[in-house]
Amino acid sequence: MMGPQGTGGLVVAPGVEIRPLKTGGTGVQSYRREQPEEYPTRLESGTLNGHGIAGLSAAVDFLNEITPAAIHAHETALMSAFYQKVSALPGVTVYGDFAHERAPIVTLNIGDMDSGEAAEILSDDYGIAVRSGAHCAPRMHEALGTVAQGAVRFSFGWFNTMEEAETAADAVRDIAL
């Protein structure tokens, strides 16, 4: 949601009993050994993440102002422009189904270059941050035959520009040639 990590919410139907896995002190009843029974303090051990809550609130305000539809359209346009350029490059293998709706992510390999090496070149020579390796998806890499090489993942977001997407595609072209 564009807010800080480590902040979230919990929606529970009336009558559902929740017992915390771990408990700790509360600022409400500091001398009690047991967690309070009343909600929400029963689930709020320790100090609340005030900064995270404020950041999450700002993220919600931002999303309400910009709208998720506008963000989706922007990210999709960036991803599509990047994909159109890199998918036509000789020696570049792009993974995934781009004929249907998808997340604004393009995963690829450049020839037989190790994905970590490609990511390092993109970072050092072009100032482009990507993710390389197995992406916590070892079975997918087994299916693709990319276990040893990994893959390079480009992720596009609201704060990226079309110029950045085109620059990234040009960098892939330069490395591939």
Spans of model-derived segments:
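Pyridoxal 5′-phosphate
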Residues: M1-L177
